[in-house]
C-alpha cells in the first residue's frame, strides 16, 4: 500500500504512531515505546557580553517508557556567561500524553509536561528559560494536530525561576513567566512514500515567545525560528535552524542564534530480551 509519510514523522515503525519532531519545541506525541534516543544539540550566536561567538552544547538522552510516558535528561556546556567553557546546567523532563484521537493520516493529541533544571548561572537578564540560563521548574500543556503532510502544534507553560535573588528587596528580576510556542511542519520530500530507507526533507516554522508575569519593566519577547530537517532511514535526524527576534522589550543575552542537532533512536532498546 502506497501512502504519504508526514514531514515531521520521524522514527516511524510498522507498529508505532508517527511523531511530529519540531526542532525548537516538543509535540504532544511521544517517541516509540521501549525505545531510547541520543541527541547532541548546539546553539551558536553573537552574545551581548563579548565579541566572540557564544556557544552552548546539549547532550541529551530520551526514553519512551510506554505509549503515554517519555522522559528526558540533559546537561549543557557553554561559554555564554564566561570566557571559557564550563559545565553549565542539568535538567530532567517528563511528558504524559493524556489524549489521542487517531485516524488515517491524521490525529489530534494532547500532553502535559514538567521540567526541573539546575544552572550554575546567576540571574543576569529577564528572558526566563530552563535551557541552561536559569534554575527552576516548568509545567505546561501541548496540543498537536496532524493532517497528512502538515502538522500544527501549540504549547503553553509557566516557568518559575528558583534563584537566590528572589530574596532581594527591592525585586531586581522577573521570576515567573508564561512561555508559549506555535509550530508548523511540512513534508517536502519524498513526494511519494515507498519504504523506510527513504530520506525525508522537512521544513518548519516556529513562533516562540515569553511573557513575564511579575516584572513591569521588561515584559516580553517574540522569536521566529525557521528550520530544515533531514531524516535518514527512519532512525536518525539532522536539524538546522535560525532563531531571530522580531520584537522584544527585554535586554537579552542573545537575540539571534543558529541551532544544529543530530539525534539517533534505538528502537526497542528497553524491551526485555526473551529467554530461550
State where each predicted segment sits.
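Outer-membrane beta-barrel "beta-signal"
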Residues: 91-94, 182, 254-276
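Outer-membrane pore/translocation modules
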Residues: 83-177
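Membrane-embedded beta-strand positions of outer-membrane beta-barrel proteins
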Residues: 38-42, 73, 94, 110-114, ...
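Residues that define the transmembrane beta-barrel architecture of outer-membrane proteins
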Residues: 32, 53-57, 85-90, 131-137, ...
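Structural signature of outer-membrane beta-barrel channels/translocons
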Residues: 62-64, 95-101, 142-148, 183-191, ...
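Short loop/turn motifs that connect adjacent beta-strands in outer-membrane beta-barrel proteins
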Residues: 26-33, 68, 84, 100-109, ...
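Transmembrane beta-strands of outer-membrane beta-barrel pores
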Residues: 42-46, 75-81, 98, 114-120, ...
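Short glycine/proline- and aromatic-enriched beta-strand/turn motifs that initiate or cap beta-hairpins
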Residues: 18-61, 117-123
Amino acid at each position: 500500500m502506497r501512502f504519504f509519510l508526514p514531514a515531521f514523522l520521524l522514527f516511524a515503525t510498522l507498529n508505532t504512531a508517527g511523531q511530529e519532531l519540531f526542532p525548537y519545541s516538543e509535540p504532544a506525541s511521544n517517541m516509540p515505546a521501549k525505545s531510547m534516543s541520543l541527541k547532541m544539540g548546539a546553539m551558536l550566536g553573537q552574545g551581548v557580553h563579548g565579541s566572540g561567538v557564544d556557544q552552548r552544547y546539549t547532550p541529551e538522552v530520551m526514553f519512551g517508557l510506554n505509549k503515554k510516558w517519555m522522559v528526558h535528561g540533559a546537561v549543557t556546556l557553554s561559554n555564554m556567561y564566561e570566557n571559557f567553557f564550563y559545565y553549565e546546567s542539568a535538567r530532567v523532563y517528563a511528558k504524559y500524553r493524556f489524549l489521542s484521537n487517531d485516524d488515517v493520516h491524521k490525529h489530534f493529541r494532547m500532553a502535559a509536561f514538567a521540567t526541573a533544571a539546575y544552572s550554575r548561572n546567576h540571574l543576569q537578564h529577564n528572558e526566563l528559560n530552563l535551557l541552561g540560563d536559569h534554575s527552576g521548574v516548568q509545567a505546561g500543556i501541548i496540543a498537536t494536530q496532524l493532517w497528512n503532510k502538515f502538522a500544527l502544534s501549540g504549547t503553553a507553560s509557566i516557568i518559575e525561576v528558583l534563584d537566590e535573588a528572589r530574596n532581594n528587596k527591592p525585586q531586581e528580576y522577573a521570576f515567573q513567566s508564561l512561555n508559549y510556542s506555535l509550530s508548523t511542519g511540512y513534508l517536502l520530500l519524498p513526494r511519494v512514500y515507498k519504504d523506510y530507507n527513504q530520506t525525508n526533507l522537512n521544513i518548519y516554522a516556529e513562533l516562540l515567545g515569553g511573557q513575564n508575569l511579575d516584572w513591569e519593566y521588561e515584559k516580553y519577547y517574540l522569536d521566529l525560528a525557521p528550520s530544515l530537517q533531514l531524516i535518514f532511514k527512519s532512525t536518525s535526524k539532522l536539524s538546522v535552524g535560525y532563531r531571530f527576534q522580531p520584537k522584544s522589550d527585554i535586554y537579552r543575552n542573545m537575540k539571534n542564534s543558529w541551532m544544529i542537532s543530530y539525534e539517533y533512536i534505538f528502537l526497542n532498546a528497553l524491551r526485555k530480551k526473551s529467554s530461550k
